[in-house]
C-alpha cells in the first residue's frame, strides 16, 4: 500500500480537536494511514490518494488540504520552490499565516518571490488556476497543492436556530461532526447516541452516511430529535425512549457511540446524581460497543 502525504490546514479553533478530527476522518475512511507530522495549525497524514474525497467530505475542523510538497525555512523556500514538480497548467500561489506565527515574514513578498519561481514556464491565473500552490506559514513555511476546501457554511445551515425543535444547550454542528469523526465511525456503520436530545450529533453522523440510532429518557426529546432528522431529510435506524441502563437490550451491538451527556444544570438527570448517571452510562456504553 502506497501512502501519499497530505497537508491539512487546520482551523485552529481548539488546541487539540482539529488534529483529532482529521485523524478520526482518516481512521474511518482508510484501511491504512499514518500521521507523519503536526504543528501549529497543521498536520501531515499519509493515505491512498483515492481516499481524499471521502476524507474531505467529513472534515469539520480543517479549512483546506492537499498533496504535501515539503517544508523549509524562509531562506530555503526559494530552493524548495525551484525543485517542485507541479502539475501542468496555470498556477496561483496562495499564502496564509497561522495565528501570528513567524510574523516577521512578509506574506506578499513571499507570494511574489515563490510565484516568480513557479511561473517561469507557465501562466499565472489568480482567478481560476489549474494549480493552486498553498504556502502555510507556521513553525516553518509549508508547501502543498490545494486540492480540497471544506465548505464550512454547511454547519451554519444546520445550527440550532435552523432546526424546528431545539434546546439552547446544544453543540455547534462543526463540533458535533468532530465528535462523530473521533469515534472512527465508518460510512455504513451504526452509531448510537444514548442521550440524543435534539439530535445534533445524529444529524452530523447521518449527513456523512453513518447509520444512526438514538435514545433519550425524555419522550419530548425523542420526538423532537425525529422532527429534526426529518426536517433535514436524513435517515435514521431507530429512535427510542430508553434509560441509559437499557440501551444494551434495546439496541444490541453498535460500531460507535457518540454523545453529549447531561451536565446536571439545564438538562435533566431525572434527579439522579450526576456521578451515578455517568457511571451507569460508561458501563452500558462499553456493553454495546463492538470494539
Language-model features: where?
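Class I S-adenosyl-L-methionine-dependent methyltransferase catalytic core
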Residues: 1-65, 71, 75, 99-100, ...
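A short glycine/small-residue-enriched secondary-structure motif
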Residues: 58, 87-88
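An N-terminal amphipathic alpha-helical segment
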Residues: 72-87
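Short secondary-structure capping/junction motifs at helix and strand boundaries
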Residues: 90-92, 119-129
Amino acid at each position: 500500500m502506497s501512502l501519499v502525504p497530505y497537508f491539512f490546514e487546520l482551523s485552529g479553533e481548539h488546541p487539540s480537536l482539529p488534529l483529532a478530527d482529521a485523524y478520526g476522518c482518516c481512521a474511518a475512511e482508510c484501511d491504512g494511514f499514518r500521521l507523519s507530522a503536526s504543528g501549529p495549525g497543521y498536520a501531515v497524514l499519509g493515505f491512498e490518494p483515492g481516499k481524499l474525497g471521502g476524507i474531505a467530505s467529513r472534515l469539520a475542523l480543517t479549512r483546506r488540504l492537499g498533496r504535501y510538497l515539503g517544508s523549509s525555512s524562509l531562506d530555503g523556500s526559494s530552493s524548495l520552490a525551484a525543485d517542485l514538480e507541479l502539475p501542468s497548467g496555470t498556477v496561483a500561489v496562495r499564502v496564509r499565516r497561522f495565528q501570528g506565527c513567524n510574523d516577521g515574514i512578509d506574506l506578499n513578498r513571499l507570494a511574489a518571490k515563490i510565484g516568480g519561481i513557479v511561473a517561469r514556464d507557465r501562466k499565472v491565473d489568480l482567478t481560476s488556476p489549474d494549480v493552486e500552490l498553498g504556502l502555510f506559514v507556521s513553525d516553518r513555511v509549508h508547501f502543498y497543492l490545494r486540492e480540497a476546501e471544506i465548505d464550512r457554511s454547511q454547519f451554519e445551515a444546520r445550527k440550532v436556530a435552523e432546526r424546528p425543535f431545539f434546546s439552547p444547550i446544544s453543540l455547534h454542528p462543526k463540533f458535533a461532526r468532530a465528535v462523530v469523526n473521533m469515534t472512527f465511525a465508518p460510512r455504513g456503520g451504526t452509531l448510537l447516541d444514548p442521550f440524543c436530545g435534539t439530535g445534533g450529533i445524529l444529524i452530523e453522523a447521518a449527513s456523512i452516511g453513518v447509520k444512526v440510532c438514538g435514545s433519550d429518557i425524555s419522550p419530548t426529546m425523542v420526538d423532537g430529535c425525529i422532527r429534526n432528522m426529518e426536517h433535514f431529510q436524513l435517515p435514521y435506524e431507530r429512535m427510542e425512549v430508553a434509560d441509559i441502563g437499557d440501551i444494551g437490550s434495546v439496541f444490541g451491538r453498535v460500531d460507535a457511540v457518540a454523545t453529549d451527556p447531561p451536565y446536571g444544570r439545564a438538562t435533566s438527570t431525572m434527579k439522579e446524581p450526576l456521578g451515578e448517571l455517568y457511571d451507569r452510562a460508561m458501563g452500558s456504553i462499553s456493553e454495546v460497543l463492538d470494539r
